[in-house]
Amino acid sequence: MLKTDIFTPSRFVGEGTVTLRGVKVPYHTVSEDNVFYDDEGKPIASIFSYSYFRSDVAAEDVKSRPVIFGFNGGPGTSSMMVHVGFLGPKRVKYGEVDHDGLPLPPYESCDNEHCLLDIADLVLVDPVGTGFGRLLDESKKDMFYGIEPDAEAFLTFVQAWLARYNRWESPKYLVGESYGCTRASTVAGMGSLSGSDRAYSVTFDGLVMIGNTVTVGKHFGDKSPIYSAVLAFPTLAAVNWYHNHPSNQTVEEFVAEAKGFADTEYLLALYRGNSLEEETREHIIERVMYYTGVSREYLERRALVLEDVEYRSQVIRQKGRYVSRLDGRITRPLYGPLLDEHKWGAHDDPAEGKYNPFFQSVLCGEVFPMLGIKTDRNFVNSHSLWSSWNNDIKGRNTSESLSAAMRRTPTMRTFFVNGWYDICTQIGILYYTLDHSDLPKDRVFVKGYESGHMAYLGEENIKAVSNDIYAFIMGKNPTK
């Protein structure tokens, strides 16, 4: 990775006010490096954090005030999306928008009237190698780049933060997005463990998982033990509902009906394969075409097996458009014959190409000055670490880590937030995970939103997601 700076630990302070639920809330901020050292005292890496503290809280009430640690995924992604997407007191402004409902340049920020700072202090986290966080010694990357090393570094940071600001007694929450759900479940499981090589003794009151990556496989990229086509079916049906309007039902009703078909008739048809009677096969083809919008030719060529990557070029093929992996509502033109689809892949996603410029413009151009951040250090929004990432978690999976944390902490609750149009982390995989794990159902909440991978995008969604997380932090059922 190219560098434009020499690392020097930094700390910046700022202050501001925001009106939340009719009350003017003053706050102060600390943005700082959290440096890791080797045995000789040499800095080897840093996590960068942005802390927001409500300023008018009585000293005796600070310890009982919740702390929310928010982060994104990747691995290799900064906290930018959750920071200016919905958690921070400044957010992206949806003023003049394009046909997908996303802002047009020039990009602007506005006060986030849905921020949770009135009820909790906020800590946005750039893990090692992301945002302003740095890996300073490449030979030490194995200490940070992997499911368990990443969680260990995160827990070490949390311990230091709690000690620095005397917040050990505060209720603690994790808000993770995408791979951040893997991080959150691993951190919660590891933090509650005793008798290990290192007992961190950090437990959490609640986890919010946005764009779920907690699975019963070793990691999210594993093939599921049943046909992935069945797990993808609810999301593909939602995308078809949005673009092709096959039914007057709501998206929730249409998806529920589609899931019922996929879990029964479609699953059995895939299992039987070529032994299907012709009449039954014809019925399955008609139903799959209706629910997902694909063509007969596609299904016959694929032996009835849907595949979500190819699906993105099929669902609105008649319009010459391709739908996004991150948000199936957002489209781009299909590639012409001279362009190689496999060469560009996820790097040419129509949603991500729109998200990143306006989020980074607002964060770097407006939020950082408000936080008092003045630095030549390059802000690394995202870079892929998959090739360097160690996915071994000693034979366990992420749902087992989360189950263990909830078993050891009987008051801990988990709230799963998923967009109906998220083809990247499909809600069907979440349903399957919950049906095949030991998670306590009375403390687990699931809600779908009319959005994509970043479920909070858009004026209606940021309000809905923020209000539901607010209810969750207040101890209520966020799905009611």
Description of each model-found segment:
Residues 41-143:
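N-terminal cap/lid subdomain of alpha/beta-hydrolase-fold enzymes
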Residues 90-93, 188, 192-293:
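A catalytic-pocket lid/entrance helix-loop region that shapes and gates access to the active site
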Residues 210, 215-224, 228, 294-480:
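C-terminal subdomain of alpha/beta-hydrolase-fold enzymes, centered on the catalytic histidine
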Residues 117, 127, 144-162:
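Alpha/beta-hydrolase active-site loop
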Residues 176-189:
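Glycine-rich nucleophile elbow surrounding the catalytic serine of serine-hydrolase chemistry
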Residues 167-179:
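Alpha/beta-hydrolase fold nucleophile elbow
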Residues 1-67, 79:
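Catalytic-loop region of hydrolases
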